[in-house]
Amino acid sequence: MNSKLTLLAIIEILTALSMGVAILAATYLLLKYIGKKRYDINENNQAFGIFTASVLFSVGYMVSSVIHPLLSLFRILSTKDDDTFHLLISFIGYGAIYILMAFIVALFVCFLGALIYNYITPIDEIQELKNNNLAVALVVGSIIVTLSLMTHDGVELLIESFIPYPDQYPK
């Protein structure tokens, strides 16, 4: 049995679950706070629920783009270091940075999706969500999800570019 590979699998599962739950909870609480405090949107509002679901899916999908770069990083780190504890700390540190970067990009993409809808239509999106307009929620949600699908690979490539690959040629 390859202990480093087993450690990689366990770390990946635990990291994905813990960070996934934390990021989705943070996103949900942020949307709930903004909806209630800033825009006075009721909790039983179906349109806001659809909008929230779209944002949660998009954020989760964008942050999932970190998984492959993290696996590459772990393989590189495991060849450099024999100490399991140091390997674990390095992986968690890099992983947190990469996940935070993907989370910030995901929030930006969601904000951009809502901004695009506001720009291309004369409708006040927030007021329509507040009025429980399902059609507006579906269109805005579709824009957000589509932008996430289109930018997912770019985010993965961006994260991949930060991996400290070893030099291929000696200097």
Where are the predicted features?
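Final/C-terminal transmembrane alpha-helix of multipass membrane proteins
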Residues: 135-155
